[in-house]
Amino acid sequence: MIWEEILNFEPYRAVEGNYRIWLDKNESPYDLPPQLKEEILEELKRIEFNRYPHITSDPLREALAEFYGLKKENIAVGNGSDELINYLVKMFKGKYIVVTSPTFGMYSFFAKLHGIPVKDIPLKEDFTIDGERIAEEGKAASAIFIASPNNPTGNSQPENEVLKVLDSGRVVILDEAYSEFSGKSFIPKISEYENLVILRTFSKAFGLAGIRCGYMIANEKIIDALYRILPPYNLNSLTMTVAIKMLEHYDIVKRRIKLIVKERERIRREFIEYSYPSEANFLLMKLDAYDYLLKKGIVVRKLSGRLEGHIRVTIGKKWENDELIKALKEFLEECRCG
């Protein structure tokens, strides 16, 4: 009854259980302030729940357009960036998509789901892309996916290397899910490159992982094409209301970004020999401490393949980071003594 390919598909899994500290999903450690939640609840009371939301999510698209100084025709929104990636892998002409491992796994996930070949052009030793190689080997690509800052390594990609790929003329999907933490973005290049698509999310810096809201910025032709195949009413009224309210309170987001960056650098200083530079809300660490931390009630992300023996640690609240630092120091001490 069910296609064999689906039964053999490796699903996305996340650790569940009653653990003390969760530092595995790159979420913000901060919930919304109670006063802001009350403000949102007042807005939600005005929604007619018996009515469908706007068919193309225009209220949020217009709010984002104003936020970035763009037109709503340059913006599409979805149920997390994942929904948008699901369509982007199959929208453009070409023989395969390009990914640059180690990187976010959902690009390959959705491509394989739709039977689209994936060409992996690995990151260099320092986790940066080789723009010339990608441009050359990606000549027949339908889309080239680049994450900057990259997940799970945390580094931003050099602008000149990204430009080499853009100059190839192939469609470049630049995933900027963590760009608020780096302060770097290619959004100003949208008007210059018709082949540039930028992915963004409300899940990380905005602290809204629970509402599942992502968006993309691109030229009007690409956005128009996407809305021809997106399901109508794809984003619900509650999600749009919360996202719009957070754009109005971006001062809260900026303060929290500063706190997270400060904590990130504090942890990095403690483990400078074992951690890589990061411009995201997490650290890549060359420590095979996943099982040890789990026994201490701390969940981090265990990595594999090229990053076997590494962990990815989301930056938490100060007390959570204190517990992490303490546990990792104990781990290192046991390694030395053992």
UniProtKB/Swiss-Prot annotation:
It catalyses: L-histidinol phosphate + 2-oxoglutarate = 3-(imidazol-4-yl)-2-oxopropyl phosphate + L-glutamate. One of its GO terms (biological process) is L-histidine biosynthetic process. PROSITE patterns: AA_TRANSFER_CLASS_2. InterPro entries: Aminotrans_II_pyridoxalP_BS (IPR001917), Aminotransferase_I/II_large (IPR004839), HisP_aminotrans (IPR005861), PyrdxlP-dep_Trfase (IPR015424), PyrdxlP-dep_Trfase_major (IPR015421), PyrdxlP-dep_Trfase_small (IPR015422). PANTHER family: HISTIDINOL-PHOSPHATE AMINOTRANSFERASE, HISTIDINOL-PHOSPHATE AMINOTRANSFERASE-RELATED. Its cofactor is pyridoxal 5'-phosphate. Belongs to the class-II pyridoxal-phosphate-dependent aminotransferase family. Histidinol-phosphate aminotransferase subfamily. It comes from the Archaea. The lineage of its organism: Archaea, Methanobacteriati, Methanobacteriota, Thermococci, Thermococcales. The modification N6-(pyridoxal phosphate)lysine is found at K204. Pathway: Amino-acid biosynthesis; L-histidine biosynthesis; L-histidine from 5-phospho-alpha-D-ribose 1-diphosphate: step 7/9. This is Histidinol-phosphate aminotransferase. SUPFAM superfamilies: PLP-dependent transferases. GO terms for molecular function: histidinol-phosphate transaminase activity; pyridoxal phosphate binding. The keyword Amino-acid biosynthesis applies. Keywords: Amino-acid biosynthesis, Aminotransferase, Histidine biosynthesis, Pyridoxal phosphate, Transferase. The keyword Thylakoid does not apply. Its EC number is 2.6.1.9.
